[in-house]
Amino acid sequence: MKISRSLSTVEVHTGGEAFRIVTSGLPRLPGDTIVQRRAWLKAHADEIRRALMFEPRGHADMYGGYLTEPVSPNADFGVIFVHNEGYSDHCGHGVIALSTAAVELGWVQRTVPETRVGIDAPCGFIEAFVQWDGEHAGPVRFVNVPSFIWRRDVSVDTPSFGTVTGDIAYGGAFYFYVDGAPFDLPVRESAVEKLIRFGAEVKAAANATYPVVHPEIPEINHIYGTIIANAPRHAGSTQANCCVFADREVDRSPTGSGTGGRVAQLYQRGLLAAGDTLVNESIVGTVFKGRVLRETTVGDFPAVIPEVEGSAHICGFANWIVDERDPLTYGFLVR
């Protein structure tokens, strides 16, 4: 066996959604910003993403993040988010996973009852706070990036579902938000194939019709996914939602950046008051909470700073190797 690369990871899930943290084995990443480092990886080392996200080491719905040095004075570390299609600008469930791992594993100075974790991401600096009792990490809340509605009541035409109307909003990534009830789309595991088809068609049509660009971060210039809302299964939840993103990937969690965007959407539509909490349920019944911290602006857009809360758990540690003799060493996807 000839090992050309060895990578160490911490395996975490947030509300059921996997997050693989790469802690060692990456090449040195040039660049003064996280976006520059991500661009270098895309151009020069994308095979690492494929090796860790694709089968046989991963699967079609895998997600992860590469730890890197911070680029801002208040950050403890930086992260580059990866998934089956490529690289994302923000990942709320990843922030919760990273913050939990940082506290559980002592990557940051821990304080009781709450420990602060600063993370540099492609979308900007994110500050998280982890409950810590001296032995165990608890729920994580993070201050999301400024979030806003980009367009209201926009329509797209899809091959299988006809005209679909919703809002395009930003919570760290752009999403097309739509009510699933008119299309008989319950947010349940049993409907996942229909949810995937609907979400993928809406995302493709929206990207073809609406050329989004973040007013302050021009590199964020596409609609990342479709978020489909419907009735929750738990009495205490406000709603359930399913995020179909990247290449037909389904988020098992309620989607952190999507929850931030939903908070902005509901607040700006007058459906969520200051001080109220959105209890957002996932396709598997796990929950994130979101609320408005304060109002702000992004370019010419009125916006809010949301806070999002959820929990994560470490479920393993792994060492992965790349053997160039293996014809499948950089992975494959059946779906």
UniProtKB/Swiss-Prot annotation:
Its EC number is 4.2.1.77. It is an enzyme of class 4 (lyase). One of its GO terms (molecular function) is trans-L-3-hydroxyproline dehydratase activity. It catalyses: trans-3-hydroxy-L-proline = 1-pyrroline-2-carboxylate + H2O. InterPro entries: Hydroxyproline_Metab_Enz (IPR053425), Pro_racemase_fam (IPR008794). The keyword Lyase applies. The active site is at C91. Pfam families: Pro_racemase. Substrate binds at G92, H93, H222, G256, S257. Keywords: Lyase. It comes from the Bacteria. Catalyzes the dehydration of trans-3-hydroxy-L-proline (t3LHyp) to Delta(1)-pyrroline-2-carboxylate (Pyr2C). Does not possess neither proline racemase nor 4-hydroxyproline 2-epimerase activities. Belongs to the proline racemase family. Homodimer. This is Trans-3-hydroxy-L-proline dehydratase. It comes from Burkholderia cenocepacia (strain HI2424). The lineage of its organism: Bacteria, Pseudomonadati, Pseudomonadota, Betaproteobacteria, Burkholderiales.
